[in-house]
Every structure is written in C-alpha cells, then in structure tokens.
Amino acid sequence: MILPIYVYGQPVLRKEAEDITPDYPNLKELIANMFETMNRADGVGLAAPQIGLPIRVVTIDLDVMSDDLPEFKDFRRAYINPHILEVGGEEVSMEEGCLSLPGIHEAVKRPDRIHVTYLDEELKEHDEWVEGYLARVMQHEFDHLDGKMFIDHLSALRKQMIKGKLGAMLKGKARCSYKVKTIK
C-alpha cells in the first residue's frame, strides 16, 4: 500500500523516533509498504517518521544506482533500530534531496565512513562499518530518526535561499508527483 509522505512542517519529522520491540505489530507489512511508497516516489531511502510513525525503521533501495555503482545491484534493505556509533573518514560534499522536502536539492557535507548497529528484517543484529554512498544515504535517513533533516546541515545563507520553498510547504503547497501529507 502506498502511504502519504509527510512534508516539511509536520511535527513528526522533528521528533526523536523510538526503538521498537521485535513483536512490533505488522512489521513486515510496514516495511513492504515503506518500500512500495519509496519506490513510487522515486526515492532511494525512507524513514518511518516520513510516513508519520515516530519509530526507528528505515528502508533503502539503491538498485537504481547500480548502473553507476555496480555494488548496489539488487541492494534493498530494511534497518530496524539503527544507530550510528561513530563517524570517520573525510567529510565529503554531495547534493542531496529528500522526499519530505520536494523540489529542494542542496550540497551537504557528511563523513564518508560510519560505524552502525541495526537489526535486519529477520531481526538479526548487525554491527559494521559502512562507507561511501551507502554511508551518506544511511546518515540522511538516520537523521530523520533523530528529528533532523538535511537542511539542518546547511549554512545560514543556503537556508535563507530556500526560505520561500519551505514557506510554500508550510502553506500546504508542496509540488511533487507523489502523495503527500502537509500541515494544511
């Protein structure tokens, strides 16, 4: 089932998400719905707060990137209760967009290496270092679980330059090709 994506201004996007227990109701169905919603909106990642749920669940599907990055062929994973334990490597700037910020794309600096823990869809524990593009996508999505958005990493000048677009979203005027839930 395709779910509406919550757009900038929705309070759930600024709340810290909670870890869930292994018996969380309908978890597999939720994950399937998140993948379907994300794919319909042409996203590569989706965090549960973006569909209105303040829980620590993220889906990432990087198969679309596999022409340029062959290591992501058939890469499709769910991350349950993910946490970043440590960051490393160098800070790399790359343009990011977000399904909750339609029409906004800005360069964001992030570490290119992270140490993460999470449960997979089978509730198996993982503790690993991740680097490169996947590390960036994870940081972007995991930010949502901490009540942050990529615009929080921008300079005051860049924030000022997108103020009009953010204001339009607050008025319920998000322009995109997928189903959204605005505050108006």
From Swiss-Prot:
GO terms for biological process: co-translational protein modification; translation. This is Peptide deformylase. The keyword Calcium does not apply. The gene is def. Its EC number is 3.5.1.88. It is an enzyme of class 3 (hydrolase). It comes from Phocaeicola vulgatus (strain ATCC 8482 / DSM 1447 / JCM 5826 / CCUG 4940 / NBRC 14291 / NCTC 11154) (Bacteroides vulgatus). InterPro entries: Peptide_deformylase (IPR023635), Peptide_deformylase_sf (IPR036821). The keyword Hydrolase applies. SUPFAM superfamilies: Peptide deformylase (SSF56420). NCBIfam families: pept_deformyl, PRK00150.1-3.
